[in-house]
């Protein structure tokens, strides 16, 4: 019998919740740690309450890192199109405003609720 991976994800924002959902879908036993009273709380204020969850224009200059190659490596492995695809699979459809991607509902709560539903599965 294959041993289940055990993973701890620190932070219950968009990235943490998405990482936890993805790991669980891959069969991992996931523990999501969040210091706030609920996961997804910070999502509700991102993008002025609309949740700008990714950007079409991603360049290494937009990110800070001691390793100048690190942002480029991450962007190559997980580009905006892959994020859009992942979110659409969960039922979050995009609205593009000059390269800034929001949920079609324009409500950050729809992103938080959908991610929480995915976590609860």
Question: Where does each model-flagged region fall?
Answer:
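N-terminal glycine-rich dinucleotide-binding loop that anchors FAD/FMN and/or NAD(P) in oxidoreductases
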Residues: 44-77, 81
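Glycine-rich FAD pyrophosphate-binding loop
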Residues: 8, 24-48
């Amino acid at each position: 019998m294959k041993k289940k991976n055990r993973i701890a994800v620190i932070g219950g924002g968009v990235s943490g919740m998405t990482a936890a959902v993805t790991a669980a879908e891959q069969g991992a036993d996931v523990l999501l740690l969040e210091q706030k009273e609920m996961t997804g709380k910070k999502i509700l204020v991102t993008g002025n309450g609309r949740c700008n969850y990714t950007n079409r224009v991603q360049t290494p200059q937009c990110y800070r890192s001691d390793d100048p190659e690190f942002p480029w490596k991450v962007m190559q492995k997980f580009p905006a199109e892959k994020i859009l695809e992942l979110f659409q699979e969960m039922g979050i459809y995009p609205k593009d405003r000059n390269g800034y991607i929001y949920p079609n509902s324009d409500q950050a709560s729809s992103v938080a609720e959908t991610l929480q539903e995915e976590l609860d599965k």
